[in-house]
UniProtKB/Swiss-Prot annotation:
One of its GO terms (cellular component) is extracellular region. This is Esculentin-2MT1. Residues 1-22 form the signal peptide. It is found in: Secreted. It comes from the Eukaryota. Belongs to the frog skin active peptide (FSAP) family. Esculentin subfamily. Transmembrane segments: none annotated. Antimicrobial peptide.
Length: 76
């Protein structure tokens, strides 16, 4: 009876270690996926901010030039 317990205990121990390693790999893969998504969202926000910033600067520049032209001609 005791001789049967040793191999079973060894199999259980090896199976537990194997399962633990698989779970660690799976968790590492899931973490990498989250980082990629975060980078993707950040890039999208960054691009949108650049686009909005450029358009606001163009509009502000046009308004500023119109105001300067108005002041120069004293038509304000």
């Amino acid at each position: 009876m005791f001789t049967m317990k040793k191999p079973l205990l060894l199999l259980f121990f090896l199976g537990t270690i194997s399962l633990s390693l698989c779970e660690e790999e799976r968790n590492a893969d899931e973490d990498d996926g989250e980082k990629e998504v975060k980078r993707g969202i950040f890039a999208l926000i960054k691009t949108a901010a650049k686009f909005v910033g450029k358009n606001l600067l163009k509009q502000a520049g046009k308004a500023g030039l119109e105001h300067l032209a108005c002041k120069a001609n004293n038509q304000c």
